[in-house]
Amino acid sequence: MSRILFKILAALVAAFLLYNLWVLGHIIYWRDHNPGASSFMNEQLARLQQDDPEAELRHKWVPYDKISPNLKRALIASEDARFVDHEGFDWDGIEAAFEKNLKKGKIVAGGSTISQQLAKNLFLSSGKTPWRKLEEALITVMLETVLDKRRIYEIYLNVIEWGNGVFGAEAASRYYFRTGASRLSSSQAAKLAAMVPNPRYYDEHRNAPGLARKTRIIQRRMAYVELP
């Protein structure tokens, strides 16, 4: 019986190592090649095609230099103020989120950095399990080790969800404001950043209570952001 358990454990460890080598290989490749669809994008496309087999995602890759500095500043101001300084994990932000959730008695805040969000979007499903959190942490370390901050941010800006089937800065800019990502104004960029925590909801409720207030707060913080 113990030999059977050992073989099962060995097989699981081998599968874990092989999967993470596969992930690492992709990340190394992405140093100078752009990713195609992320795991999360594929998951959302499958969801949309359950209702409409012809459904397609709105997505177009654009280089880092073709994205407005306003949007770059707005997202860091909203999602990860210490992005250029930390190594993938903002421990102060995690502690603050934990204390806020503890005080409210439910999860109302997250401490995920841009690198952690990217790890989830690129490789993981939307489910929440201890295994997924462990894998997210490992992938985050790989991203931060292999890629520089600018490349991490460029990929993030191009794969982040911004609405029902809307992914990336260029698609979001054209979907909401009928302009390219390079031409976004400060207020437009701040509004897009404000939508990120719940993009499909804000896609359907663009005048939702609190969205305008959050947009103004982000816009005020943008001047203090350091870009990679």
Curated annotation (Swiss-Prot):
Catalytic activity, EC: 2.4.99.28
- Main localisation, per the record? membrane
Catalyzed reaction equations: [GlcNAc-(1->4)-Mur2Ac(oyl-L-Ala-gamma-D-Glu-L-Lys-D-Ala-D-Ala)](n)-di-trans,octa-cis-undecaprenyl diphosphate + beta-D-GlcNAc-(1->4)-Mur2Ac(oyl-L-Ala-gamma-D-Glu-L-Lys-D-Ala-D-Ala)-di-trans,octa-cis-undecaprenyl diphosphate = [GlcNAc-(1->4)-Mur2Ac(oyl-L-Ala-gamma-D-Glu-L-Lys-D-Ala-D-Ala)](n+1)-di-trans,octa-cis-undecaprenyl diphosphate + di-trans,octa-cis-undecaprenyl diphosphate + H(+)
Q: Pathway listed for it?
A: Cell wall biogenesis; peptidoglycan biosynthesis
Could you confirm whether the keyword Protein biosynthesis appears in this record?
A: no
The listed locations are: Cell inner membrane
Provide the family line: Belongs to the glycosyltransferase 51 family.
The protein, known as? Biosynthetic peptidoglycan transglycosylase
Q: Which gene encodes it?
A: mtgA
**Which cystines does this chain contain?**
none
| Residues spanning the membrane | 8-28
Q: Name one GO biological process term.
A: regulation of cell shape
Q: Which UniProt keywords apply?
A: Cell inner membrane, Cell membrane, Cell shape, Cell wall biogenesis/degradation, Glycosyltransferase, Membrane, Peptidoglycan synthesis, Transferase, Transmembrane, Transmembrane helix
**What function does the entry list?**
Peptidoglycan polymerase that catalyzes glycan chain elongation from lipid-linked precursors.
Which NCBIfam families does the annotation name? mono_pep_trsgly
Instruction: Give the highest taxon in the source lineage.
Output: Bacteria
Q: Look up the signal peptide feature and give its range.
A: none
Q: Which GO terms describe its molecular function?
A: pentosyltransferase activity; peptidoglycan glycosyltransferase activity
GO cellular component annotations of the record:
peptidoglycan-based cell wall; plasma membrane
Per UniProt, what is the membrane topology? Single-pass membrane protein
Task: State the taxonomy lineage.
Answer: Bacteria, Pseudomonadati, Pseudomonadota, Betaproteobacteria, Neisseriales
Q: Does the keyword Membrane apply?
A: yes
